[in-house]
Amino acid sequence: MPLASDVKQKIMSDYATVERDTGSPEVQVAMLTRRISDLTEHLKVHKHDHHSRRGLLLLVGRRRRLLNYLSKTDINRYRALIERLGLRR
């Protein structure tokens, strides 16, 4: 389930390091986190939707890889991001 363009723009403006930033790990992780939360809410209602559950697991893995990359390259940005998003590690 893709995000609406206005939601994407809001996330980009909130987490971008420079203007028109779409590829930084912070923006990517924030967008994945939003998609994960949307899918989690969907799965609370539709418990037997296993195709969406697999998609959720893929998104979580992608976010985990981006967070690992960020923690290895710049630990301060990583800590700030997980605190801002409310993720636990």
Curated annotation (Swiss-Prot):
Entry-linked Pfam families: Ribosomal_S15
Signal peptide: none
Any one GO biological process: translation
Gene Ontology molecular function, alphabetical: rRNA binding; structural constituent of ribosome
Keywords: Ribonucleoprotein, Ribosomal protein, RNA-binding, rRNA-binding
Cross-referenced CDD domains: Ribosomal_S15p_S13e
Family matches, as SUPFAM superfamilies: S15/NS1 RNA-binding domain
Gene Ontology cellular component terms for the protein in this record: cytosolic small ribosomal subunit
Top-level taxon of origin: Bacteria
UniProt family annotation: Belongs to the universal ribosomal protein uS15 family.
HAMAP family (UniProt xref): Ribosomal_uS15_B
Subunit field text: Part of the 30S ribosomal subunit. Forms a bridge to the 50S subunit in the 70S ribosome, contacting the 23S rRNA.
Function: One of the primary rRNA binding proteins, it binds directly to 16S rRNA where it helps nucleate assembly of the platform of the 30S subunit by binding and bridging several RNA helices of the 16S rRNA. Forms an intersubunit bridge (bridge B4) with the 23S rRNA of the 50S subunit in the ribosome.
Name assigned to this protein: Small ribosomal subunit protein uS15
Organism: Frankia alni (strain DSM 45986 / CECT 9034 / ACN14a)
